[in-house]
Curated annotation (Swiss-Prot):
The gene is trhO. It comes from Salmonella choleraesuis (strain SC-B67). Catalyzes oxygen-dependent 5-hydroxyuridine (ho5U) modification at position 34 in tRNAs. GO terms for molecular function: oxidoreductase activity, acting on paired donors, with incorporation or reduction of molecular oxygen. GO terms for biological process: tRNA modification. Transmembrane segments: none annotated. This is tRNA uridine(34) hydroxylase. Its EC number is 1.14.-.-. NCBIfam families: PRK00142.1-1.
Length: 350
């Protein structure tokens, strides 16, 4: 019987990855296409990726695939060939290569079958996810940014927008993509005659969002090909001004890629200029927040004095207090409400 799941502890896997000397490349990709049997596809692809020492996070559903992974550089071309020949729909698929990468983004391969590769909350049977907006390449993005008739819409979470975004882009204030979709329609009604340009990290969210906007009567809709990652890469390669300001948040150990030198966010504890996300060191919290080096030292990597005090307790007492809590082990746990309640940050949506 083939091994279809990891059998080694996280701590052991992470230590092994950190000790690796071979460089790795962090890659993200997605594809909306029909998968008749997601579980069967998942099991077959897991064996392919495991044989190539691929780490990362992969989601499959009837609607397609969404992946963020790291691949040993010596096996990168073999990986590309095997991915492209795995299914005709994946042939020639664009791979977004990380902009800043130390090769330590992942240490285990997790591959899951889900209802959707992006949780959108859409239950309208008449919605056609393939009726997407037009792609915008890097040069066209810069032209659109100077067009007074264009409105740029950020389809990422509030904490992603906080550390970096395109010039004058509108934030759709929400904690999840499924909450953003109806809000985007509502907020943009007054701009229905404008050119709507949608973007996200790698393209997967803004592609579906563009189809949703068209479904709701918006006719002039574009989305940035390959998202922020592809835009920044192509703009640099082509010698174009990079019009994204700040840092691009990513959902792996790096938690961000520097796009421009500007730091547009602030430490959530003291207000100093800072755009470095971290998780509260208290295992009973794990709040995702922005913390400067000074506050990291002052609070021992915790988000509050309460968590700092709890972290200093004996491990047995910490475990007792964590029992039954909902907050632990949510690595990207930063709902606006929870963040504000723990750090007393005013909610701009209120």
């Amino acid at each position: 019987m083939p091994v279809l799941h990891n059998r080694i502890s996280n701590d052991e896997l992470k230590a092994k990855m950190l000790a690796e000397s071979e460089p790795r490349t962090t890659i993200s990709f997605y594809k909306y296409f029909t998968i008749a049997s997601p579980q069967q596809t998942r099991d077959a692809l897991y064996q392919v990726f495991t044989a190539l020492d691929v780490f990362g996070r992969v989601y499959l559903a009837h609607e397609g695939i969404n992946a963020q992974i790291s691949v040993p550089q010596s096996k990168l071309e073999t990986f590309r060939q095997q991915l492209y020949t795995f299914d005709p729909a994946l042939d020639g698929l664009r791979l977004n290569i990380a902009l800043e990468d130390d090769g330590k983004s992942f240490w285990v391969l997790r591959m899951k079958v889900r209802d959707r590769i992006v949780a959108d909350g859409i239950d309208d049977p008449s919605f056609d996810a393939s009726n997407v907006g037009d792609y915008l390449k890097a040069a066209d993005v810069n032209v659109m940014l100077d067009d007074p008739d264009a409105v740029f819409i950020d389809m990422r979470n509030h904490y992603e927008y906080e550390v970096g975004h395109f010039e004058n882009a509108l934030e759709i204030p929400a904690d999840t993509f499924r909450e953003q979709l109806p809000k985007a329609v509502e907020m943009l009604r007054e701009h229905a005659d404008k050119k709507i340009v949608m973007y996200c990290t790698g393209g997967i969210r803004c592609e579906k969002a563009s189809a949703w906007m068209k479904h709701n009567g918006f006719n002039k809709v574009w989305h940035i090909e390959g998202g922020i990652i592809e835009y920044a890469r192509r703009a640099r390669e082509q010698g174009l001004p990079v019009r994204f300001i700040g840092k691009n948040f990513v959902f792996d150990e790096r938690m961000g890629e520097r796009i421009s030198d500007e730091v547009i966010a602030h430490c959530h504890q003291c207000g100093a200029s800072c755009d470095s996300h971290t998780n509260c060191k208290n295992d009973g919290c794990h709040l995702l927040f922005i913390q400067c080096p000074q506050c990291a030292s002052k609070f021992n990597g915790c988000c509050s004095e309460q968590c700092c005090e709890e972290l200093a307790l004996p491990e047995e007492e910490q475990r007792r207090r964590r029992a039954g809590r909902e907050n632990g082990n949510k690595i990207f746990n930063k709902s606006r409400g929870r963040l504000n309640s723990k750090l007393s940050i005013p909610d701009p949506a209120e």
